[in-house]
């Protein structure tokens, strides 16, 4: 029973992380912080002066 519960919790955690990761990029003109967060802006956009361009 405990093993099954643990497996369910791990599965939920993995789903949550993968789902939030898919929607974590910022679209054009969204605020962003610094160039070290390369994944902050969506693909093809860069963080310039605090905005994704």
Swiss-Prot record:
One of its GO terms (molecular function) is toxin activity. Keywords: Disulfide bond, Knottin, Neurotoxin, Secreted, Signal, Toxin. Disulfide bonds join 25-42, 32-47, 41-52. It is found in: Secreted. Expressed by the venom gland. Residues 1-23 form the signal peptide. GO terms for cellular component: extracellular region. The presence of a 'disulfide through disulfide knot' structurally defines this protein as a knottin. May have neurotoxic activity. This is U1-poneritoxin-Dq5a.
């Amino acid at each position: 029973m405990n093993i099954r519960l643990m497996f369910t919790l791990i599965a939920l955690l993995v789903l949550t992380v993968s789902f939030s990761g898919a929607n974590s990029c910022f679209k054009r003109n969204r605020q962003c912080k610094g160039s070290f967060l390369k994944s902050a802006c969506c693909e093809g956009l860069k963080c310039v002066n605090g905005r994704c361009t």
